[in-house]
Amino acid sequence: MKKQLKGQQSFYDDKQRENVVSYYLMEDPVHQIYGVALEKSQENAGLIEWDSIPKVTDSMEVIDHMINSLIKYKVTPISLAESLDEIMTREEENGQSQI
């Protein structure tokens, strides 16, 4: 499984510590399946939270759209599964899904 950084978002918590969420495209080149991974790190603490869903779709276009939505809405690892589910549901309702 290959992992490629697609973007980052920074924010400060209630104790004024900088948090950085990194968004990765995961690719299984053998089976042409794409997924997503998120990692949240904090200054002076390193990696503090992560999650991944390695098998989401077989479409690079769909996974790129999903990752861009995750970045836009500053999704953190703890809400990754719920957020992906919401994105997929909305696309199906709009008739735009290729999944």
Please annotate each region the language model reported.
Residues 30-52:
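A short, structured beta-strand/loop element
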Residues 44-99:
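Mixed-charge, Lys/Arg-enriched low-complexity segments
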Residues 18-28, 95:
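A positively charged, amphipathic N-terminal helix/segment that binds anionic biomolecules
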